[in-house]
Amino acid sequence: MQAKGDTAIGCVLAFLRRQAFGIAVLACAATAFAFPSAFKEWGGVKLMSLVVPAIQIIMFGMGTTLSAADLLRVGKRPWAVAVGVFLQFLVMPFMGFLLAKGFGFSGELAAGCVLVGSVAGGTASNVIAFLAKADVALSVTMTCCSTLLSPFVTPFAMKVLAGCFVEIDAMKMMVEILKVVIVPITAGGIVHALLKKQFDAHKAVCDRILSFISMTGICFTILALTAPSRDTFAAAGVAIVAAAVIHNTIGYLSGYWLTRLVGRFARLGEAEARTVAIEVGMQNGGMAGALAVGVMNSAVAALPANIFSIWMNFSGSVLASWWGRTAGVRKKTVER
């Protein structure tokens, strides 16, 4: 007979395994906050200057996992994609603006709140969708679509909503998105097409390697952006964290319930609702951080994206763990 202590320890270990990435993200943020000088510069190189290359590597890895089928899938799931894009590029940027105003942020900090709401879906969303028993194929398609739209929509949203806080060079931002996101993804797609047989033959290994690279890149970005913005974070305190939590929660709730509402006549179910919720709630914080550094040259503007990334990766892991456990129960209920 198994002892209660063993059962408790097993539950704790299982929980830690499920939340491993979220815990790693929190640990990186706490470490950089506690020892900022250790993560500002290595060997004369400012770590913040390596954020853009890190995001480019992540985007290249994402490109190697995509195919033409991911885009063609839009025709099969138009309503789900439409709901996701609507929330991603209209509701989330506007909520970033309202939160910045509501919490009394100004200048680069306020612009950063709008920026994190104006970027595409996060690269970690596909992994979270898998763990949450959502529609992974739809998740990949939505991430792909929002990313391809971002060079045009993100600069426009920033110009309209963040222009009252700081001067926004929309053209420079468009070029930066093309350089940081679109070019690496395209290059990754070309490599995948040229080496398709090799990728298909070793898919499991490639997926594990790419996931590790992506997660490592995200953790590095958090370290590199938390250290130089520590003082601003300490000054903003609870307000900037509260704004990130509210923004993320609104993304999850609006994505889930609007999809359920549209699903009444568009044949969208629980899996689609979970997918849209994850895609909308999990913004590409790394991309927002790279734009803050590359276009605005500001660690302060990158702070909201950094806090959002830390929180969303933790909340996403918790949400995926809960949904993953309840998927079977909900399915049985529907079948009855």
What are these regions (language model features)?
Residues 2-101, 159, 163-267, 327-336:
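Structural signature of multi-pass alpha-helical membrane transport proteins
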Residues 60-61, 123-130, 153-155, 250-256, ...:
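Juxtamembrane membrane-interface segments at transmembrane alpha-helix termini
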Residues 73-74, 124-135, 260-263, 290-297, ...:
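Helix-loop junctions at the membrane interface of multi-pass solute transporters
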Residues 78-85, 105-118, 134-144, 172, ...:
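The feature identifies polytopic integral membrane transport proteins across all domains of life
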Residues 87-95, 118-124, 139-159, 178-184, ...:
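Membrane-embedded alpha-helical segments of transport systems
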Residues 96-133, 261:
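Hydrophobic transmembrane alpha-helices that form the pore/transport pathway of multi-pass ion
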Residues 246, 259, 277-279, 292, ...:
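Generic hydrophobic alpha-helical scaffold/packing signal
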Residues 293-336:
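C-terminal-most transmembrane helix of multi-pass membrane proteins
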